[in-house]
Structures are given as C-alpha cells and as structure tokens.
Amino acid sequence: MFGEYSVNNNQSDSAARGPRPDSGSALGNLPPESASFVGREPELGHLNHLLRERRLITLTGVGGVGKSRLALRAVTGGRQTRRDGVWWVELSPLRDPALLSATVAHAVGLADHSARSLDEELCAWMADKELLLVLDTCEHLVTECRHLVGELLQSAPGLTVLVTSREPLGSPGEQVVEVRPLPCEGPDSDALALFRERAVAATPQLAAVFDEPGRAAVATEVCRWLDGIPLALELAGARLRLWTLEQTARRLGARFDMLADTRTALVPRHQTMRTAVGWSHELCEPLERLLWARLSVFTGDFDVGAARAVCSGGPLPASRVERVLAGLVAKSVVRRSEARGAGTRYTMLDTIREFGLDWLTELGEVRTVADRHAHWYAALSRAADRGWLGPGQVDWYRRMTAEHAQLRTALEHLLGSDPTAALEMAGALWFFWFSCGHVHEGRAFLERAMRAAPCTGTAYTQALWALGLTALLQGDMEAAQRLGEECTREAARLADPEPELRAAYLHAVAVMMPGDAARALALAGPRARAGHGGRTSGPGWLLCRLATSYALCDLGRFEEAAEEARGLHEACAELGERWLRAYADYVLAVAALGLGEHGEAARHVRAMLSGKRLLGDRFGIALGLDLLAAAVAALGDGELAARLLGTGHAWWRTVGRPQMGGSPSLTALRDQGERQARAAIGDAAYESAFRGGAAATTG
C-alpha cells in the first residue's frame, strides 16, 4: 500500500522508518480473468485504438455476448496504461442509483469523508489524474451513469472512460461499439474454439472427441444454433459431461424448432440467449432449479453459509445446499472463485440471475427469500459489531468488505419492509461506516432509517451515535456536537451504561476537534476512570480512554496522556484488537514528540501505520504519515520529512479532508514539521521532495 521509506539520520534508531512509495507495479484494481480469452483479435485491436484516441467508449450488445470479457481483456496485461492507473467498477450488484458515486469512489480508492457531495469530490480528485475508468454493466443505471460520466469527463481532462452496457449512455462524444457474437463458420471459427475449450475445461477427456473426423461439423452446428453467443456456448459445453455432441445438437435443434413459429418481442439474439438459459434450466435437477431461483436475491458474490441460510427450506434442507450448489457450479450456472481474506465466493452472471428471479417470481417466493436474505445480513452485522473490538477484527474487516453489496441490498429491503430492523442494522454497522471508509453511504442509510423508524430505544440511540461518528469524519462538527448531546440524553434513559460511554466519547471528540480540549476531558475523563458501570471493559470505556488521552495531549499534559494511552494500548492488546490500539500508538507518538523523544515517537507512528494498513483506514494512514513527518523532521532528516508530507498530502486527498483533519493541535504539529524540514534543506529542495512523495501510490 505504501511500502517502506528509510530514514537517514545520525541516530541508530530504526524506528524512524516509514512508508516508501511502491515502484514497478501497475496501479489499479482489475479483477483476474476468470478463464482464458478466445478470439476477438480484430475487436481487441479496434478497441485498443479507440482507448488511445477517444475519451468515452461504450461496448453494447446482448447479455452473455462477452462485453465485460472483451473490456477486461483490452485493459489487462499492460495493453492500456495510465499514469494514475486503470480502475474497474463493477455495477452489476448495485441496485440503488443514489449509491453510484459511492461505488465509483470506493473502487478508485477515494474514501468518502468530505461533507461535499460525492460527485463534487470525485470530480476534484480526478481533476489532475490520468486514468482509465471502466464502468461494467451499466444498463440499469444509464441515466445516472450518463450524468456522472459527463461531470467527470468535463472536470478531468486526463480521464478515459470505458463502459459496458446493453444500451448506450447517449452522452455527447460517446463512441459506441457493438460487441457481436463470435463467428461460427468454418473449422477454425472463434465460436468453435470457445465451445471446444469450455467443454474440455468441464470434461477433459472431450479433447479427443473434438479431434475425431466429422465431429467438428456437429460442434459447428451447435455453435450455429446458439448464434455464437459465448455464455450460451459455455452452458452447452457444460452439458457435454452428460451428453454426446450429437445428442446436444439434436436436443438444441428440437428446442429451437419448437420456438421457430412462436411470436416474440425479443430480437433474435436476445431470444437465443434466453432460450439457451431456459434450456439449461430445464436440464437441471429440481433442487438445482429451486436453488437457482432463490440465489437470485443475492447481488454480487456470496459464500456458502449465506446460501445455506437464505436458500434452504421446504424440499431443500440446509444440509443439501452445498451439494446442490456444487451441481450448479458444474453446469456453469454459478461461478466459484477464491477471494483474498474472504474464502470461497459464488456469483451468477446477470443474464442467469435475471432468469432465476423470474422463476422465483413464478414460485411466489420473492418476498420470503428477500426477507431471509435481509435478516441474515442484519444478524451478520450485529455479530460483526460484537466482534469488532476483538481478535477477529481484521477478519471482520475483510468479511464485511466482501459483503458490501449484500449489506446494501439487505438495508434497502429492510427500509421498505422493517424500518426498525433497518435502524438496528445501520447502527450496528457503525464500524463499517466510520472505520472502513464508507462515511457518506453510512450517513445516508442512517438518516433514512432514523426517518422511518421510531425515535426511541436502544437501536435509535445507537444509530444517533453512529450518525455522529460519520459527521465527525466529515468535519461537520456542528452536527457532531448536536448529535453527541442528543445521544447523551437518549442514553441516560437506558439501563445499560454502554450507550452513555459511547455518547460521552462522541460528545468529547466533537468539542475537542475544534479546540476545546478542557471540555472534552471533562466529558470523557470521569467515564474513562469509572469504566463500564464500574467495570473497566467494553467498547465505550475504551473509546473514552482514547478521547481522554487525546485531550490530555492537546492540553500539553504529555506524561499523563502517555500513561492513559499505555493503559489503553495494553487493554486493546489483551483483546487482540488493532484499530483502537493503533490510535493509542498515535497518542503515544504525539506525547513522545511533546516530551522531546523523537525516535520513540517515530517508533509508535510506525506501529500505528501498520495497524491502519491492515484495516484500510485511510484517515488513520493520513494522520500517521503527517505525524511521522513531524518526528522525522525533529530527528533532522528534512528531505524524508518533506517526502512523507507529500505522501500524507496524497492520502489526505483520498479522504477528501484537509491535512490533520482540521484539528488545530494536529495541524500545528504538521506545520511544525514542515517548518523544520524547510529550515533543514531549503524551500526548493523541500518542494522537490514533497512532489516526489505526493506521487506515491495510495491504492
């Protein structure tokens, strides 16, 4: 993420080492190619030419024709490079158009901590970038994509956008390229090559069959029946586990002959694709068809535990879901992949998912299965809330990041069907909104849930607190203070002391950030000492200790601050917790700087950055880089301090906030480091080193 900077100073203290920009690796987030790419050399050449010459290219075509595969192939392997990377935005799981900007921001590594609209923030962030943005599967968001792409292209002259969609955006200057099915004629056709490869991948012994004299003509007939549509060919290839080529050709022929005289509003290729999917559906076992239908409520990928919980019932017991799911994978209806930190995941292509949803509607189960999906992810959110400040924190971060699309879908459903459950779920996800870079999105969900649900009780108080945290990170201190006061009043009505401690933390930080450390200490200090109803445990107590240590630093009481932070650090270490422990390291670093222990300060900042890196906490990384620069400047290495400040500047841009988050005391530390660095190496050398650091990667 930010590598390893080395420090050059006269002290032997290796603690004054921090991040070094990565080099030699391509920037971006391109997904791996799920299978080998067959054919389309002319299309690839044309598309690569357009990507060098035009700024907006849209690949159109029927579902299953290979738009996404062609786009991915065109931008991988160094075929397209940009100074600031190639970024892939998967829009297929997105159902709420209001979250389009948040989805794009998250994909490109822009955390949404600004109070400005995300459209504005994206435009400002991309203004000086040279990058290629791929928006994949836009047909259900055409109007919103047209608006956002127009704004981005106008604001960012170095931006190129590649879109895949079943229909064009209709934007000025858009270059539309229709992706056609693969050619089917001849023994060397692309369609035949793809059919053969997918069939052999499913059943390796078929390689010899395709080489037999006369079999190529039969395989070509299958390709013609399926119009050379790649997804249809893949589904047919999977059937060769059970049938010969000749049986497949005969059954397909019978299927299409039956439909030949049927009146339909579908254009031929759409009809071919839907017929091929329907044929695969008919050939599934009854339980496979049922699971296919129920899986259609998932948006994006999912794991087997979720499939078991959401899709079991009636004739499909939970104990059989995994085996039936494996059958759908074998038939190429469901795709299986391994995700780093998230284990085995499953997904369906949109065309297949849409067919399943139609079948689920026929079964009359849409509401029932959607309810089960929503309540499963609500329960997962509550479990993550309970486990966040514990040894499984990094695993929870990775798990919930992988489940982002499902969390959105569940919240949207609950907002319409069970607002109280939506409120509880949105509040339980406080750590996801606050710690994992989804502040705009979290604030929007929380505000919607609070408008829809009763304004009282534990769930409402928790939501107030979570909303206040999002306001804090957006720099909306007026709202944060107001919410802190309201949360304190609501918490006092509850029997549980935990909400009172959380409210005290929110209120304290909300008054401390603008500069009132004395009041912050008065709010958090007594609760940090008293603990959780007399017990020194629980998240609220830990947070109050953090606020207390911050306030003591701001008041210049560095020894007391260090003592408080050490106690917090030890408590977090006992829990196996990383997020708060990293902030304890941050306070220890600030206190060490105040006490003149510059090497010790650098050591603590490095520990802090290590923890924040594990959890993708961009705000924390930005804070840490500026503080490390101050420590390094105090140690006498002005050049490295300038580079670190430049890198910190790049990270602050990814959170859309001013450096040091706007806090007067923290800004003063950063400014002191800059003055010392300039004094050590001069303004010209400082600016050069700063620019070098600012070019560091933040992906």
Locations of regions flagged by a protein language model:
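Glycan-recognition and catalytic cores of secretory/periplasmic carbohydrate-active enzymes
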Residues: 327, 462, 522-526, 532-534, ...
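C-terminal non-catalytic interaction modules
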Residues: 1-25, 639-699
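Acidic, Ser/Thr-rich low-complexity linear motifs
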Residues: 384-399, 615-618, 654-673
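Aliphatic-rich helical/repeat scaffold segments used for oligomerization and domain docking
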Residues: 1-5, 10-441, 447, 619, ...
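Tandem amphipathic alpha-helical repeat scaffolds
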Residues: 387, 423-437, 459-477, 498-516, ...
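Tetratricopeptide repeat
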Residues: 407-410, 429, 442, 446-449, ...
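Short coil/turn linkers that connect adjacent helices within long alpha-helical scaffolds
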Residues: 416-417, 453-456, 490-497, 529-538, ...
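Alpha-helix C-terminal capping/termination sites
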Residues: 225, 396, 403, 415-416, ...
